[in-house]
């Protein structure tokens, strides 16, 4: 099969053009195209997503590609396949180690790493989909002392909260709200548990904004972090969730130990490529697990691989897609900085005819490559 791309080098279009990937896409277009095909099903979409993966990774966007996979996993998979988060965390950690040790081009040309990258992509694509969680609204009036006193204190004392709460370091409200939070988890009331999580986050923010301290003076966060960050209420919640899971697992037969621990670690020990929003998403998914999984018919995470032979065949095509992209020179410039500019583009006013012709020619070449991928995937 011929994987030679008809796309000409981006540098030939003109020096005043935006920075482009190795295959000739504008960076924002490459990201947009990848996100679009990631949400599509079928063999043709899988081929396109492999092409855009190879293009982004080999253009210097390896960490950006990871962020896009995390984004898809949290926004479109979630509780439908908790195993994918454990898998991605482990595989990304392994690949990050190799990426930092090896020269970039050597990493890109390694067949082993190409297959690992393709496997991550294909397994994410194969996951069942579930719409993202909707966060409940927390009205401002709920942060008044009167509302708190009238709305908490009715839940029975939680054993899990009792093992985490420290009277010498934590405000009493953490115990009262913690008991309400634990009761919500035990009742399977996901929305109510998310409400109390969000309430604690907002209460912490209000206290700091008004320079009234914080909800806790206990360092529960990772060593090496600033003291104020280590005392954030989010670490109190992860500790409570860990205790809730320990109590639930033997009672309900829940078997998600690795998945749950990986999600807790994504919040507690995030790497530099994991955004704050995704940390909160990981915490929300932990809440959803303890609320909903005990009520599943089989309280375990579904397997990621349903057809090992089909996955092996698909991963085997990775080398061809990477070879196609690596035939072009790497982009010159900071492509990750270009990617941060966002997807909004400002059309030029009255462009020159010559420039229009070059742009049209490039778009036709990109379309030709897409057709080539379509035709190839249609025969497999």
Model-inferred region functions:
Residues 14, 19, 48-51, 58-380:
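C-terminal alpha-helical interaction modules of replication/initiation AAA+ assemblies
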């Amino acid at each position: 099969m011929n994987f030679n791309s008809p796309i000409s080098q981006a540098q030939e279009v003109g020096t005043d053009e935006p920075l482009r990937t190795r295959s000739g896409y504008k960076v924002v277009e490459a990201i947009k195209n990848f996100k679009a095909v990631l949400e599509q099903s079928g063999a043709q979409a899988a081929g396109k997503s492999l092409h855009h993966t190879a293009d982004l990774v080999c253009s210097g966007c390896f960490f950006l590609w990871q962020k896009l996979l995390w984004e898809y996993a949290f926004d479109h998979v979630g509780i439908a396949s908790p195993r994918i988060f454990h898998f991605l965390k482990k595989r990304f950690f392994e690949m990050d180690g190799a990426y930092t040790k090896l020269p970039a081009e050597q990493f890109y040309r390694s067949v082993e790493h190409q297959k690992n990258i393709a496997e991550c992509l294909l397994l994410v694509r194969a996951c069942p989909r579930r719409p993202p969680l909707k966060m409940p609204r927390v009205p401002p009036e709920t942060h008044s002392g009167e509302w708190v006193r009238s709305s908490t204190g009715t839940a029975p004392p939680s054993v899990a909260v009792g093992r985490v709460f420290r009277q010498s370091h934590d405000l009493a409200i953490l115990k009262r709200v913690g008991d309400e939070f634990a009761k919500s988890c035990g009742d399977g009331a996901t929305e109510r548990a998310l409400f109390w999580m969000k309430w604690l986050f907002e209460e912490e923010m209000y206290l700091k904004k008004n320079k009234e301290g914080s909800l806790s003076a206990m360092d529960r966060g990772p060593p090496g972090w600033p003291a104020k960050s280590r005392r954030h209420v989010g670490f109190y919640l992860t500790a409570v969730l860990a205790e809730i899971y320990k109590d639930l697992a033997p009672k309900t037969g829940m078997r998600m130990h690795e998945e749950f621990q990986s999600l807790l670690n994504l919040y507690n020990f995030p790497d530099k490529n994991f955004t704050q929003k995704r940390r909160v998403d990981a915490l929300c998914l932990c809440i959803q697990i303890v609320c909903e999984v005990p009520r599943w018919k089989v309280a375990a995470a579904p397997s990621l691989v349903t057809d090992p032979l089909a996955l092996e065949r698909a991963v085997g095509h990775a080398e061809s897609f990477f070879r196609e992209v690596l035939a072009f020179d790497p982009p010159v410039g900071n492509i990750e900085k270009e990617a941060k500019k966002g997807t909004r583009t400002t059309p030029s006013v009255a462009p020159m005819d010559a420039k229009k012709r070059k742009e049209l020619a490039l778009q036709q070449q990109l379309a030709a490559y897409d057709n080539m991928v379509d035709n190839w995937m249609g025969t497999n």
